[in-house]
C-alpha cells in the first residue's frame, strides 16, 4: 500500500517553527558575555545542544584541542555542557597568561571532582587563590625543599633526596633480580610505584614505609583511580546529571580519595605522637613546628588539622609523577636499545663501576639528561595542567576573557608544536644537545612544558627532575632492560591527569657486569 506524501507545513506551523528558531538564536546570543569595545570576541567551533563539544574531545582531548588550535588560534573557546571553557595553546601565549599575567589566571574552577580531594581542602585543586593560599603554598614549597634537595649534614649524600633514592634504587634492583630469578619477567610499573611512594614517604615522615605495608600498597597501586577522574575535561565536572547516575569511575575516585586521606591522617597522627621539636627530620615535622609557632602567635596560617591537606598534595604529586616518568622511561629504553647502550656508555665513562651515580654527576651526563628531556616532551604525560580560572575580567591576545572563566592549558600542544620542534613526532634526544654533544642546549630545554608555569607551577618540579635522573642513572649503571624478541610493547598513551602506557608484564632486567 503506497504511503501518501507528507502534507506541507501550514503558514501557522511555519511561523511557529520560525519563532522557535529565532527564540533559540536570541537566547544563545543573549547568553554570550558582552565584549568591551575595542576587544575581540573569543573564536571557536559551534557545539551540539546540551553536549557542547564533549564529542569533539573524544578519547584524546589534548590532540583534539591541538587540532582545533590550528584553525582557531592560540586562544579559543569551547563549551562542555553549558560551561564555556577557554583553551590556551602556544608557548608564548601560555607564558603571557600564566607568567606575565599570572594574577589574572591563577585561579582554579570550582569543580565537582575537586570537592572529594582532601574533602575539598587541597591546596593544589581548591579554588582558593588568596593570600592565605599563597602563604601555605610557600610554606609547603620551603618544607619540601628543606627535606629533599637541601643538604643533609648528617649524611655522606649531598642531600636528603640523594640518600633516599640511592637506598631505594638498591632495593628496586634487588626486587627486579628476585622477579627475574622467580619468573623471568616483571611489570615495572607495579614495582616503581612502591619505590616512588617509599621515597616521598621518607621525605614526608622521616622513614620509608615497610616494603610489604598493606596500607601503603593498597593506596599507591590504586592511584590510577585518581588520575582517571581528575583530568581536564572530566564529564562529571561539566554534566551534573552524571553525579546522580551509576558511575563506576566516579565511585572509584571517591573511594580512593577517602582511603588515601585516612591513610595519611593515621600516618600524620602517629608521627605527631613521637614528634621531636628539637630535631626536625622531615616535611611533616617542619609543618608541625610551624603550626605550633603560629598557634602561639595566633596567626592561624596553618592550623594543625590542615597539615594533612598539605602533606596530601606533596605526597600525591611525589609518587604519581615520578612513577609515570620512570615507567615511560623503561618502555622507551626497551624499544630503543641503541639509546640505552649510549646512556650506559656515558655512565661507564663518567661514573664507572666502583660507585653509585650521584646528583653531582648530572652536568657530566648530558645524554642521559637529553633522554629525560625528550621523554618529557615526546610523551607529554601531563597533557594539561590542572584547569585554571580567571580571577577577574582580563584580556589575552586582544580577546576578552570574563572573570571566573575555566581555562584549559594544553601542554601537549606546546611539546608537539612543529614551529618549535620541527619534527615533534620523532623521538630524538640529540635535539637537546649542543653542537659538540657535551652539554644541554638550555634555551631549547626550557621550552619543554610538563610542570605548568607561573603561580601554579608544580612545587615539586625540581624534586621530580632530580629523582628521575638519579633513579635512571643507578638502574642503568647496573642493569640492562629488554623484552623478549617478538613481544610487542604498546606505547599508546591512556588519557588522564597523567597519561599512562598499557601495562607491560614482559620486561626483563639482567646484570651488566658478571660480578653483580
Curated annotation (Swiss-Prot):
GO cellular component, one term: endoplasmic reticulum membrane
Cofactor annotation: heme
Pathway membership, UniProt: Cofactor metabolism; retinol metabolism; Steroid metabolism; cholesterol metabolism; Lipid metabolism; arachidonate metabolism
Inducing stimuli: By beta-naphthoflavone and 2,3,7,8-tetrachlorodibenzo-p-dioxin (TCDD).
SUPFAM superfamilies: Cytochrome P450
Amino-acid positions noted as binding heme in the UniProt annotation, renumbered to this chain: 458
Residues the record marks as site: Involved in electron transfer with reductase: 403
Membrane topology reported for the UniProt record: Peripheral membrane protein
Superkingdom of origin organism: Eukaryota
Record-given protein name: Cytochrome P450 1A2
Gene: CYP1A2
